[in-house]
């Protein structure tokens, strides 16, 4: 059994991310949750917040996205995330992240 899950992040404009990951954490309406390979199937509403992709190390995210509202479909081997917006904030400064967050909140 593989230790990775296939991840696809989709916005209305394009596929933002499509790769395998060890774990994903997402901002669900009921709170933050994580998904690993083999997770039980589910469909969950997402709220605006941070989506973290753990590719090599399960203790440190490799990529972090600021997302708007959306929905995710999880099966044991893949996760599809459909969101209004997904902004890669991995390499941004704290001030740049605050600016992106403020702009996102105003657009919602």
From Swiss-Prot:
Entry GO MF terms: ATP binding; proton-transporting ATP synthase activity, rotational mechanism
Membrane topology: Peripheral membrane protein
Entries under Pfam families matching the protein: ATP-synt_DE_N
Subcellular location(s) per record: Cell inner membrane
Top-rank taxon: Bacteria
Keyword Nucleotidyltransferase: no
InterPro entries in alphabetical order: ATP_synth_F1_dsu/esu (IPR001469), ATP_synth_F1_dsu/esu_N (IPR020546), ATPsynth_dsu/esu_N (IPR036771)
Keyword presence, tRNA processing: no
Keywords associated with the record: ATP synthesis, Cell inner membrane, Cell membrane, CF(1), Hydrogen ion transport, Ion transport, Membrane, Transport
GO-annotated cellular components: plasma membrane; proton-transporting ATP synthase complex
UniProt xrefs under Gene3D superfamilies: F0F1 ATP synthase delta/epsilon subunit, N-terminal (2.60.15.10)
Subunit architecture: F-type ATPases have 2 components, CF(1) - the catalytic core - and CF(0) - the membrane proton channel. CF(1) has five subunits: alpha(3), beta(3), gamma(1), delta(1), epsilon(1). CF(0) has three main subunits: a, b and c.
Similarity comment: Belongs to the ATPase epsilon chain family.
Alphabetized NCBIfam families for the sequence: ATP_synt_epsi, PRK01474.1
Reported function: Produces ATP from ADP in the presence of a proton gradient across the membrane.
The protein's name in its UniProt record: ATP synthase epsilon chain
Native species: Rickettsia bellii (strain OSU 85-389)
